Amino acid sequence: MFPSRLLEKWWLRAFIALVIFFVWQLFYAINRVQSLEEERATLQATIEVLTRKSDGLRTQIFEKERNLVRLNGKVEEIDTQIRDHLSLLPRVNRSTPFIYFITPTHFRAAQRADLTRLSYTLSHVPNLHWIVVEDSDELTPSIAGILKRSKIPNTHLNARTPSDQKMRYDDPNWTLPRGVEQRNRALLWIQNQLSGVKEGVVYFGDDDNTYDLKIFGEMRKVKNAGVWPVGIVGGMFVETPILEKNGSISHFNAVWKPERPFPIDMAAFAVNISLVLSNANALFSFDVPRGYQESTFLENLGIHRYNMEPLAEMCTKVYVWHTRTEKPKLSKESIDRLTKKTGFNSLEAHALGVDN
């Protein structure tokens, strides 16, 4: 009877219920904590497993990247070997006339760059002999290095322009004739060293002009003296001979000194080597009027308009452009160093080709 009385008291029943609730919550919390600890341990174990796998994958990736670097190095080595072997293959086709490509060159900021670019063009041309003539008292190791690396059959010469005929850095290109001594040095070399040659073509190619490989095929067609259009020259998009219906030359479209016997650029013609060998006095001169270097040379070879051969699909295509590398804008101090060829740091010297 006593317990029933106690239970009849509502507050006692509520207290007992509350105690039971808190006890249940305590057991639940303890179980939950134990469960979380187990989950944490499981998760930590999983993380450790994944970390080990990640380390393993990272090691594999590193090994594969290292192998890739090795393979890339091997590919480059093989490419180099292939290029070297190809360069050593015979470049001479006896049925194809040789081109004697004469390039006068002088020291300037872009000389090394221009000759490097030109060497890559000429390296694609078989049966070509590159005659490079420096405007200097001695041969430059930098230019010799370009010629050696090009694997092009070549002759390296030098001829100094007289001081009274040399232009200052800021002089316009047309102030004085350029390449006179250098072209003559090359012509004399041809006359002395190639006197027994029966076939071949002589061409004067500036080191900063642009050449389509097709122009070399046109040169090989020359029987006497060939002529073709030249782009970006003489204040025009194209300078070209104008032909009659029968294919002979009527006149030229030049606007600068059109009265010249041959109002064309040096890049516009090539001559058979037999003409050079049989006309030893056909040389260039400082004593001709400005713009008459080409005309005087061709006339001294006995060339006339009527016996020139229009090439490049009867002068309807342009395969050579008289491009010019722009002079860099330099300070007076830099121009002075360039003129004296001194005072360069090692990187500048390498860029300019004075690092020997």
UniProtKB/Swiss-Prot annotation:
EC number: 2.4.1.135
Residues forming the catalytic site: 294
UniProt-listed InterPro entries: Glyco_trans_43, Nucleotide-diphossugar_trans
Major localisation: membrane
Catalytic activity: 3-O-(beta-D-galactosyl-(1->3)-beta-D-galactosyl-(1->4)-beta-D-xylosyl)-L-seryl-[protein] + UDP-alpha-D-glucuronate = 3-O-(beta-D-GlcA-(1->3)-beta-D-Gal-(1->3)-beta-D-Gal-(1->4)-beta-D-Xyl)-L-seryl-[protein] + UDP + H(+)
Disrupted gene: phenotype observed: F1 adults accumulate eggs in the uterus. Embryos are predominantly arrested at the bean/comma embryonic stage.
UniProt binding sites for Mn(2+): 208
Keyword Amino-acid biosynthesis belongs to the record: no
GO biological process, one term: reproductive process
Topological domain spans for side Cytoplasmic: 1-9
UniProtKB keywords: Glycoprotein, Glycosyltransferase, Manganese, Membrane, Metal-binding, Signal-anchor, Transferase, Transmembrane, Transmembrane helix
Membrane-spanning ranges: 10-30
Record GO cellular component, one term: membrane
Transmembrane helix listed as a keyword: yes
Membrane-protein topology: Single-pass type II membrane protein
Pfam families hit by this protein: Glyco_transf_43
Residue ranges that the UniProt entry lists as topological domain Lumenal: 31-356
Glycosylation sites: 93, 173, 246, 272
GO molecular function, one term: galactosylgalactosylxylosylprotein 3-beta-glucuronosyltransferase activity
Compartmental location: Membrane
Function: Glycosyltransferase required for the biosynthesis of the tetrasaccharide (GlcA-Gal-Gal-Xyl-)Ser core linker of heparan sulfate and chondroitin sulfate. May be involved in the biosynthesis of the HNK-1 carbohydrate epitope on glycoproteins. Required for embryonic development. Involved in the elongation of the pharyngeal isthmus during the later stages of embryonic development. Involved in vulval epithelium invagination.
UniProt record similarity statement: Belongs to the glycosyltransferase 43 family.
PANTHER family the UniProt entry points to: GALACTOSYLGALACTOSYLXYLOSYLPROTEIN 3-BETA-GLUCURONOSYLTRANSFERASE 3, GALACTOSYLGALACTOSYLXYLOSYLPROTEIN 3-BETA-GLUCURONOSYLTRANSFERASE BETA-1,3-GLUCURONYLTRANSFERASE
Name the record gives this protein: Galactosylgalactosylxylosylprotein 3-beta-glucuronosyltransferase sqv-8
Organism per entry: Caenorhabditis elegans
Encoding gene, per UniProt annotation: sqv-8
